[in-house]
Amino acid sequence: MATTAQYLPRGPGGGAGGTGPLMHPDAAAAAAAAAAAERLHAGAAYREVQKLMHHEWLGAGAGHPVGLAHPQWLPTGGGGGGDWAGGPHLEHGKAGGGGTGRADDGGGGGGFHARLVHQGAAHAGAAWAQGSTAHHLGPAMSPSPGASGGHQPQPLGLYAQAAYPGGGGGGLAGMLAAGGGGAGPGLHHALHEDGHEAQLEPSPPPHLGAHGHAHGHAHAGGLHAAAAHLHPGAGGGGSSVGEHSDEDAPSSDDLEQFAKQFKQRRIKLGFTQADVGLALGTLYGNVFSQTTICRFEALQLSFKNMCKLKPLLNKWLEETDSSSGSPTNLDKIAAQGRKRKKRTSIEVGVKGALESHFLKCPKPSAHEITGLADSLQLEKEVVRVWFCNRRQKEKRMTPAAGAGHPPMDDVYAPGELGPGGGGASPPSAPPPPPPAALHHHHHHTLPGSVQ
């Protein structure tokens, strides 16, 4: 409180509590301009006092941002001959007054209005740079509330000095040391970081772009290098596999030439396509049909299947050529290929004798088949197969002949059939059905006639 009483405005009578005349707002603006002009030429001692006053102002401030509006009341320093009576020093001395005064108070509110005057006087020297600085820095440069003890100073004054040198050392450090020393290290650090951000803010996009571009090139180069590192191995492996498969797999011309030679050799040796397929199944376990061999010779199989079948056919040809000198081996191979016997043609007279024997006995015994084969000079197996085929033929013909009898039963009632209607039925045939069955039959034919 002693400090507050020391810097209270003095009236014309020289007392600390005296009430002097109030100054008009226009005169207050002129006084503020004069104070700013003197502040720009102040010495080191004044700067020390300014530090003290600014520090006290920040410590005892109400924490409300104030602008540069014209104050309603401006106390004057026209009295007493103290050290701080009058002049720009008095204005800054008044700034350390009590910060709890109201704007409409004459004495107690002088501290608040003195802060307004101090705000205008302290930053009037940088008023020429406030507009452009605010345009460049923007509201994002305002310090945080905790940077200077909870007080939020105006961003246009201190921040203008951060970008544009003022009268007090120049630059950010000079202005902080001269006019903003009481702001504390927190605000200094915030301003320092904000200044760097303001300087680097336009440059990050190109920097990031260049870095991203270079990093993208490096990353792409790394990927290409990795791909190039992996690709030769994979490519080499694939090429080696491809070369290996190309060496093993024949070309289309080789397959065409082999198919032509195989067909000529097969015909010359007397084997059919079915014989070759069966022989392959007997020799190598892979049974091929006659259609497959035919398609191989006609080059109608797929390239993969042609490549698979060619080695087997080539082995079969080699086996056949090696056994061509010995008829026994050749007959053995031919017998292996010809598992199905040839079709036997029977003469008309022999066929008639077999037919007459079939009418007598459709299913002869083994002894009868042997005697019949000897009498007809046929093989026993031929006679047996003929009787089997004849019985199958009879079965196929009998259902067609018996298919006409059921309609006869539907047309004629059982009672209307005469004694000879049964044909081969014996005399002890069952009697005709009772009238009830006949009535039931008529019930189905004429449902409306019988109730």
Swiss-Prot record:
Where is composition skewed (Pro residues) in this entry?
A: 427-436
- GO cellular component terms listed in the entry, alphabetical order: chromatin; nucleoplasm; nucleus; transcription regulator complex
> Which residue ranges does the record annotate as region Disordered?
1-21, 69-114, 127-154, 186-253, 395-451
The organs and tissues expressing this protein are described as: Expressed in embryonal stem cells and in the developing brain.
Please verify whether the record's keywords include Transcription regulation.
yes
Give the location in the cell: Nucleus
Task: Please list the residue ranges that the record marks as compositionally biased, kind Gly residues.
Answer: 11-20, 76-85, 95-112
Q: Where is the composition biased (Basic and acidic residues)?
A: 190-199
Record's family?
Belongs to the POU transcription factor family. Class-3 subfamily.
- Functional description taken from the UniProt entry: Transcription factor that binds to the octamer motif (5'-ATTTGCAT-3'). Acts as a transcriptional activator when binding cooperatively with SOX4, SOX11, or SOX12 to gene promoters. Acts as a transcriptional repressor of myelin-specific genes.
Protein name according to UniProt: POU domain, class 3, transcription factor 1
Source species:
Homo sapiens
Q: Which gene encodes it?
A: POU3F1
